[in-house]
């Protein structure tokens, strides 16, 4: 299923721009609203969607995404329900790549072979599992690749030259560069160093490199887009959704628009910025 991911980046390259990768939490604030948001993202300008798997112990996530996960869990969202939402999304959109992002525990509990069968059938294109290092590739990464699912790795400012080949060895789809250290949504990246970091990674791989963590505005997205193949935005979108909720964490009449209006701003930032030449 990496074909959809490859095609998305090819379209963006043809337009001379970076891709916009948007993250939302599955089931936040409830499954039906979550599906409406998912369906609206590509129409607002998202090229690729990361769909978060709610989990009780999200160690790499900041307060915004932790709160989103709790709202989703409270609404009854689980892995089976998340795959069901993607199946419904695919009824109307067979073009936009969907990448599941989360932690290994729910997948392990579901059962890896069963999960991979169901994920493939639902129309999932790739996986980001933040707590499975390369040393544990046999657990999920290699079986996922055999099923045709991309397994996407994270690289960070602390990933040195000795570690990078291991991180990239079985990566497929794209590489996700975490532009700051720490948890999501808690700082602003050093935009000046992003292009240098991307160049360091692309010296070791031909895969697209997307950059995330700390991108909050269209201006931020435009800065990142100059030197990366894609810009990832998550916490800012989750925050926008949270601010739109009514008491009791209920979706309001403007909840979907709260997310998509920011996506349109981010898409404008990405689309207004020509990518810098390699090495610039």
From Swiss-Prot:
One of its GO terms (molecular function) is tryptophan synthase activity. Its EC number is 4.2.1.20. GO terms for cellular component: cytosol. Disulfide bonds: none annotated. It catalyses: (1S,2R)-1-C-(indol-3-yl)glycerol 3-phosphate + L-serine = D-glyceraldehyde 3-phosphate + L-tryptophan + H2O. Keywords: Amino-acid biosynthesis, Aromatic amino acid biosynthesis, Lyase, Tryptophan biosynthesis. It is an enzyme of class 4 (lyase). The active site is at residues 50, 61. Transmembrane segments: none annotated. Pathway: Amino-acid biosynthesis; L-tryptophan biosynthesis; L-tryptophan from chorismate: step 5/5. Belongs to the TrpA family. The alpha subunit is responsible for the aldol cleavage of indoleglycerol phosphate to indole and glyceraldehyde 3-phosphate. Tetramer of two alpha and two beta chains. This is Tryptophan synthase alpha chain. It comes from Methylorubrum extorquens (strain PA1) (Methylobacterium extorquens). The gene is trpA.
């Amino acid at each position: 299923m990496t074909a959809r991911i490859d095609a998305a980046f090819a379209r963006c390259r043809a337009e001379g721009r970076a891709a916009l990768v948007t993250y939302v939490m599955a089931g936040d604030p409830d499954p039906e609203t979550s599906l409406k948001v998912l369906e609206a993202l590509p129409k607002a300008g998202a090229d690729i969607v990361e769909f978060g798997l709610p989990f009780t112990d999200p160690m790499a996530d900041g307060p915004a995404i932790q709160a989103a996960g709790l709202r989703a869990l409270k609404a009854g969202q689980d892995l089976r329900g998340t795959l069901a939402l993607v199946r419904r999304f695919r009824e109307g959109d067979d073009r936009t790549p969907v990448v599941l992002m989360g932690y290994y525990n729910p997948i392990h509990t579901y059962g890896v072979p069963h999960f991979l069968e169901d994920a493939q059938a639902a129309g999932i294109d790739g996986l980001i599992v933040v707590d499975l290092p390369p040393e544990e590739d046999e657990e999920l990464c290699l079986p996922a690749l055999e099923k045709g699912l991309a397994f996407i790795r994270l690289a960070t400012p602390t990933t040195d030259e000795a570690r990078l080949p291991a991180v990239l060895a079985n990566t497929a789809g794209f590489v996700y560069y975490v532009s700051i250290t720490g948890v999501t949504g808690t700082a602003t990246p050093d935009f000046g160093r992003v292009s240098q970091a991307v160049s360091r990674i692309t010296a070791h791989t031909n895969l697209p490199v997307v950059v995330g963590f700390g991108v909050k505005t269209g201006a931020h997205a435009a800065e990142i887009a100059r030197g990366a193949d894609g810009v990832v935005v998550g916490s800012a979108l989750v925050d926008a959704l949270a601010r739109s909720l009514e008491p009791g964490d209920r979706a309001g009449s403007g909840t979907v628009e709260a997310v998509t209006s920011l996506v349109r701003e981010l898409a404008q930032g990405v689309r207004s910025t020509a990518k810098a030449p390699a090495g610039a």
